Amino acid sequence: MPKSTYFNLALLLLAPALQAQSGRYGPAHTWWEPGQGGYLSWDESFDNADGQVTIANRKGSVQTKDHPFFEPLGTNGRACVTCHQPANAMSVAAATLRERWIESGGRDPIFAAIDGSNCPDLPQDQSASHSLLLERGLFRIALSWPPKGADRDSIRPEFRIEVVRDPTGCNTSAAYGLRGADPAVSVYRRPRVAANLDQLTAGPEGLRFMTDGREPTLESQATSAILVHEQARTRPTPDQLRRIVEFETQLYAAQGADVRGGLLDESGGPPLLGPANLSHGKAGRLAVSSDEMPRLFDIWRKPAGAPDLGLQREFRASVARGSDVFFARSFRYRVAAVTCATCHAAGITRWMDIGTTTAAAAKDSPDLPMFRITCDPSAEPHPVFGRVIYTHDPGRAMISGKCADVGAIVLGQIRGLAARAPYFSDGSARTLRDLIDFYDRRFEIGYTAQEKQDLENFLRVL
């Protein structure tokens, strides 16, 4: 019997017991501390509640000692790995952060006042001062206002921004707010996945890595992160930047095993799943070509009229149906018929406003700030909300200064989802079902209960 068959059988028999303890499967987590040293294996797996996420490096194992991604380069003890944890698919999960708060007594560098708290002038020893990070996985992002271009000259914005609600106090703070010596707007966002980056750089729009698309290259992103988030006093050296970018672009993250579905990248399985398939595929194509999409999960489909196939095969059949929902179930977006895959495909890194941050479409979040955007009469209006918009994150507009960009967010990748809840840039979807329900409500799709379950199962194995 093949090794994968033994593994899958054992997984199905033992999943309940394994979830009940911090064993090979279940809710156990591994926190990677800056400067801890050791190797990150070429193929490393970490437990999560749905199975395991796997981090694969196509160039082999990496010695993390003295590596600039893993060593602190600033003054607050952080490294790149602090906010891009392998166990969380090279991002962070809110549940992991709550565990880390307890384990470290709130002293881990990830809770640094600069952006790991709701505002730096709050009492830093209180968990309430870090509530957005602990509950929603959100870091504070301070953006200059008015925005500055690449030459650091101010851009004349097409709109006026007013603070309507400020629960963190940072946007009205004398030191950190709009009336400070260096006027800034504080928004709160999830960290992006620092893996699978060839899927982002090879697309038609090129690299758009950050939530608002403000960094043109991975080198500039790393430089900004080290100067701001690590609070370094000097810029990273060219060699440090080279090593960071080299590491990030050879790394792949995806769910590797599921407690019900078994090994996800076993030989002969769907070519869309697992980091190994990603690393072997052509950059920007989700490891497969577009004409292969409809047949991706044929091997997991349930034959018509077949009896119950058992837990694993029934789950896999559900994933196959979920892929149909993702790739083929159409709905209306503005004037066109689209599918999930229309926007969430490899290489698609455009920014758009799907309503996650604008008050007219999103559920209200009293713990986040609220801004009123009033656009100039001469400006091109927002394509949906016109010239007066209420939002807790103006998105791309904070960089471009354009009214039409208010609320527009660069689409995030959807790999390793099971390892890094919550979802959306503002952490507003606590679960995958919350994410699906948002789209169903926002675009009046009309998913059936079965379609929702199948789509959820599909997303959890990516």
State the predicted function of each range.
Residues 1-9:
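Bacterial N-terminal signal peptides that target proteins for export
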Residues 11-20:
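Hydrophobic h-region of N-terminal signal peptides that target proteins for export
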Residues 20-462:
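Periplasmic c-type cytochrome electron-transfer domains
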